[in-house]
Amino acid sequence: MWGLNNSVVSITMVSRYAELGVDVHKKGIEVFKAISHSLFPYAFCNVGEDPDLPGYGLTLHTDGAGSKPVISYLLWRETGSVEGYKNLAQDVLAMNIDDIACVGAKPIRFVDYVALNKFKVPREQVLDALSLGFSECLTHLKNHGLNVRFAGGETADLPDQLRTLDISGTVLGRVKLSEAVTGANVKPSNVIVGLGSGGKTRYEKAENSGIMCNGITLARKCLLKRDYAVKYPEVCDPEAKGYYGRFDVDTYVDEEDLGMTVGEALTSPTRIFTPVLIRVLEKYGSCITGLVHNTGGGMTKCLKLGRNVHYVKDAVISVEPIFRLIQKESHEDWRSMFEDFNMGIGFEIMLDVECVDEVLSLVEGFGLKAQVLGRCEAADGRNRLTIRSPFGVFNYEGS
């Protein structure tokens, strides 16, 4: 559990994650802002006018599963299981669908992109597992009122470019412009409600570690044994830091109350929050000013939402076991941990105080953990974030 102390940490340092070649700040992508267009510049993702439906907007979103396919590959090589490949289907859908949900959009079409090295990866087995995963996940979404159609995709054999495989997807969504969550109205006095990334909801079949798809490079390298880089050199760039952990992929871990194997924890599929969010928006949309999917950037992701907002997260929460284990094994500083990982909070809702109790009750009705994380205050010039934890008080600024 978090507690509070009086230390304030705002020192900039190179994180363990950055040392592995991953930039959570994604420096350089700002050049694309000059050629992109959005009706709502302070929203979580871009929205453009629907040319065929007056009063509606379209959002087109692309994302992938990061380096999670490497874990799926290792799990297959060591155990013969293709479950990790199947889980990637939900990962890719979740990373896209929940992002567009942040503007209130519902998904209508989805395509995937799979690139692999067929000299290393069992092409047919991977595609069969992914097909089954997409089919099950899309059926599940349809049962919850989200009729997103699979519209095909691309499979590329790229042995000279890829060591193992990569997977991503693109979703097309539509939103009624008068009901869009624009982020422009996030204001002082708004409350921040967090939705849990781990555990098991009433609409899920298994326990989830909460890892989602971010921070995986650090997670796998600090947890898994160095032998894997020797046995399967394709799972690690020889010029980068290798694996230095204590565990096999099939090691069952009780430490930090994890209660599953390392492979299960690292391939836990990213939770899809949209079935819950559409109900929240239907009933309490007028109270909601902002929505944030805590993917790249972890608990600092809110910095891209709204303008001149100081997000203060000072509530007591439980950091999921997988993140406590990663921190212990990697020795990543806690300030960076909150940037690298969601830490157990996969989604955030900014809303008016009078709706908080009702929203919490609705969300918890799905068996999804939810709680008040903090509040919004005024900021001058740029967005800011303060996280209070037992490990220090950490301050962050938006770009």
What are these regions (language model features)?
Residues 2-399:
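Helix-biased detector of long, well-ordered alpha-helical tracts
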